[in-house]
A protein has these predicted regions:
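An edge-strand/N-cap motif at the start of beta-rich repeat modules
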Residues: 29-55
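Blade-level signature of beta-propeller repeat domains, shared across WD40, Kelch, NHL, RCC1
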Residues: 339-374
Length: 374
């Protein structure tokens, strides 16, 4: 009896020792951190398991309006609207590495985001400059700009050509950089291909004349998450288009090869009132967006799930609408988030598209986007 008791005790002890690392491994597989901007001047980090706010990083540069993770996932770049500032943070520690403002008492800038070069030295953006003179203000044309993050100043600008300035999208258009840092892409109703050495447009890719033959008014689908990298050379996004005969609006999935400069478009179905961004799972096989139909009291919002291998819509589910919101995803692709212009984050299961819970942030989240970090 004593032998059996000792044996059972040993088995229980061994089971406990095995269970601990398994539990830790299971927790580590799903544990992550969300980073998002809040009013008036902070970045919050949120535990993506409990929803608890872990850090509140104050930005002297003001209100964050865009967030971007470097391609190597080592740095975070935030831009602010209060002082036209740039903040660089360490992605692991969330500590501020660099922070400065471009505005002066007589000069103001306005830009919404941008993209760092592979070295992390320069930051490319599109901006407008406002000069305060003795008797008036002057406003520049839209300009391509290079910001030296070490010198903390704008080192090069080139005015945007009138034909490109007139394209829909404004200075909120998405920017991407080629892997070698030699080419900047600006996604409007055309893709502007810009040489980073001269800041001159060297090519204009008309999307309706690419592999989207038979369609007109092909344009990038909106949202701060509009462009997603499925691998270092390829972007995937939602695009909208219309047939050239009765002009019915449709949407589809588009892929853009940053190296070959090749665009492919696969139509999926009729367009809704609004399509908000695209979130792609880490394995690049599944993507999610939200679609809105109707207005005000008759508004209906749905999650749409896509298989990126077959390029088909595989599932959809209605969820509670908000007047304004942004779609986000956890770093493991298991959860979807509805957030922005509110004090909370709604959590949904990505597999079932069902509501799970709401996390209270205790602060008003901006529309700067959300980064899912390990």
């Amino acid at each position: 009896m004593q032998l059996r008791s000792r044996l059972l005790k040993s088995i229980h002890t061994l089971s406990a020792l095995i269970a601990v690392p398994l539990a830790l491994a299971s927790g580590a597989a799903h544990a992550g951190t969300l980073l998002l901007g809040t009013y008036p001047d902070k970045l919050f980090t949120v535990d993506d398991t409990s929803g608890a706010v872990k850090d509140k990083v104050k930005l002297d540069a003001g209100l964050p309006v865009s967030l971007r993770l470097s391609d190597d996932h080592k740095k975070i770049y935030a831009t602010t609207i209060t002082t036209s500032g740039i903040v660089v943070l360490d992605a692991d520690t969330r500590k501020i590495l660099n922070q400065f403002s471009l505005n002066t008492p007589t000069v103001r800038y306005r830009f919404m985001g941008g993209v760092p070069d592979p070295s992390g030295r320069y930051f490319y953006t599109v901006l407008i400059r406002f000069d305060k003179l003795n008797d008036r203000y002057t406003v520049s044309k839209q300009q391509y700009a290079v910001i030296d993050l070490m010198q903390k100043k704008i080192v090069r600008t080139v005015d945007m050509e009138a034909q490109d300035d007139a394209l829909p999208g404004g200075f909120r258009a998405s920017l991407m950089l080629s892997p070698d840092g030699k080419t900047l892409y600006m996604f409007k109703s055309k893709v502007l291909v810009i040489d980073t050495a001269s800041l001159k447009v060297v090519d204009r890719i008309d999307l309706q004349k690419a592999d989207a033959a038979g369609y007109e008014d092909v344009a990038l689908g909106g949202g701060v998450e509009g462009l997603q990298l499925t691998h270092p050379n390829e972007l995937v996004s939602l695009f909208t288009a219309a047939d050239p005969y009765v002009h019915n609006k449709i949407f589809g999935l588009g892929r853009f090869d940053l190296t070959a400069r090749k665009f492919t478009f696969t139509p999926i179905g009729p367009i809704t009132n609004q399509i908000s961004g695209l979130e792609v799972t880490p394995d690049g096989k599944t993507a999610y967006t939200t679609a809105t139909n109707g207005l005000t009291g008759s508004k209906r919002c749905e999650f749409w799930k896509f298989d990126l291998t077959s390029l088909k819509l595989t599932d959809k589910q209605e969820f509670h609408c908000r007047s304004r919101y942004t779609l986000g995803m956890s770093q493991d692709g298991a959860k979807l988030y509805i957030y922005g212009a509110s004090y909370d984050i709604e959590v949904y299961d990505a597999g079932t598209l069902k509501y799970e819970k709401t996390w209270d942030l205790g602060a008003d989240a901006t529309m700067a986007g959300m980064l899912a970090l390990h």
